[in-house]
């Protein structure tokens, strides 16, 4: 009996983890298109906190900044390269170009979920150097 309950819990956790992965990708896709406010309404928990050092930690401040960036960069492209999801955490490694012809930046977003909502978000990014000795690249 314990095995059956464990299997059912594991399947439910796997389903929620996959849902979290899909939400994280949709959140970033919407934000890149200038729909960060909508993404926050859809997916952020009421007590959402982000850890980007350039903005206040609340959802509204981050959404304002993300939407402003999308307006300033209407040709912005976000391409998800890979994701890692385990339990309440989802990591998205993406390439981002703000303008056509720009070098891509490697950006990693780390999401923490509670009850199917994004409750915490971290992000780090680095522009791909034009002259790098690493022939494997950043992606």
Label the model's feature ranges.
Residues 1-139:
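C-terminal and inter-domain tail/linker signature
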């Amino acid at each position: 009996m314990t095995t059956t309950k464990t299997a059912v819990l594991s399947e439910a956790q796997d389903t929620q983890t996959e849902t979290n992965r899909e939400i994280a990708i949709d959140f970033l896709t919407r934000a890149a298109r200038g729909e960060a406010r909508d993404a926050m309404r859809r997916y952020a928990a009421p007590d959402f906190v982000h850890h980007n050092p350039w903005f206040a930690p609340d959802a509204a401040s981050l959404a304002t900044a993300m939407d402003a960036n999308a307006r300033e960069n209407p040709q912005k492209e976000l391409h998800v390269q890979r994701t890692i999801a385990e339990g309440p955490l989802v990591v998205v490694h993406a390439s981002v170009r703000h303008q056509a012809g720009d070098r891509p930046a490697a950006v990693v977003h780390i999401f923490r979920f509670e009850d199917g909502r994004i409750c915490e978000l971290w992000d780090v990014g680095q522009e791909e150097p034009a002259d790098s000795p690493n022939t494997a690249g950043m992606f």
